């Protein structure tokens, strides 16, 4: 056996069943989010014939929750059981996703319906992401938090890179609304994996402080860190620029260049 593989298999995190279940659930959710994002653009462009402005609004709805709810979500999740939040977010996403192929089969699918589902998916993703990031210190010892976050980030990058490719390949075989069934399956796998975690979770601390005070405390902490604040600023700028590309690329490929989703 290769030394690197042996070291990975015998790493304490690999033998930590709670972390491995969280990792599996987060990986499935990341892939599902990326596949669903591509399917949403394909439906809007090829089936509902949405305009560029409407596609822009649709794409914004998928990410606006991170801007509007990201900070309050962090404060709220601090006072909730993280595992319960992740399971609830996954189940809500499953219900929203299944409604798309259902409406498509009944010939009642509209752009408004798609926008509502996109906004709901974005909202649930915010709470899921905040909860799993806050859950890592609970199930992994302080010594291995860096390694745990490294594995989770690797899954995010793999999902970000491979999810659209998988979604494009699937769109070559089935109608875009039916791809949502696979996306719902990934969230079902995520729900199952996280439900299997049996690690005890401490009772959430409820400070009783007003929501705005909790948000201000978090922002003050980030601003006071010489490494965190520049990193936060770079990530925010990259996410803003990347969102613009994600809006324009499907329009360019599917409408302007008249290419298939598989291509």
Segments the model singles out, each with a brief description of its role:
Residues 1-263:
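Alpha-helical transmembrane-bundle signature of multi-pass membrane transport and export proteins
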């Amino acid at each position: 056996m290769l030394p690197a593989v042996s070291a990975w298999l015998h790493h304490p995190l690999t033998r930590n069943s709670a972390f491995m279940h969280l990792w599996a659930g987060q990986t499935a959710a990341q892939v599902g989010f990326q596949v669903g994002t591509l399917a949403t653009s394909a439906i809007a462009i090829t089936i509902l014939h949405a305009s560029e402005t409407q596609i822009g609004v649709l794409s914004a709805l998928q990410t606006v929750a991170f801007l509007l709810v990201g900070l309050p979500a962090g404060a709220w999740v601090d006072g909730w059981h993280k595992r319960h939040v992740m399971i609830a977010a996954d189940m809500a996403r499953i219900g929203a996703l299944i409604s798309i192929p259902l409406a498509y089969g009944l010939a009642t699918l509209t752009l408004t319906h798609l926008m509502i589902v996109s906004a709901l998916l974005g909202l649930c993703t915010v709470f899921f992401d905040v909860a799993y990031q806050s859950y890592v210190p609970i199930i992994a010892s302080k010594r291995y938090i860096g390694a745990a976050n490294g594995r989770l980030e690797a899954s995010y990058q793999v999902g970000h890179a491979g999810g659209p490719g998988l979604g494009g390949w699937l769109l070559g075989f089935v109608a875009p609304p039916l791809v949502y069934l696979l996306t719902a399956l990934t969230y079902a796998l995520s729900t199952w994996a996280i439900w299997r975690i049996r690690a005890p979770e401490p009772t959430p601390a409820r400070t009783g402080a007003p929501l705005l005070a909790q948000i201000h405390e978090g922002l003050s902490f980030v601003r006071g860190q010489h490494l965190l604040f520049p990193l936060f600023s770079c990530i925010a700028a990259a996410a803003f620029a990347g969102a613009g590309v994600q809006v324009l690329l499907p329009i360019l490929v599917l409408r302007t260049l008249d290419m298939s989703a598989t291509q």
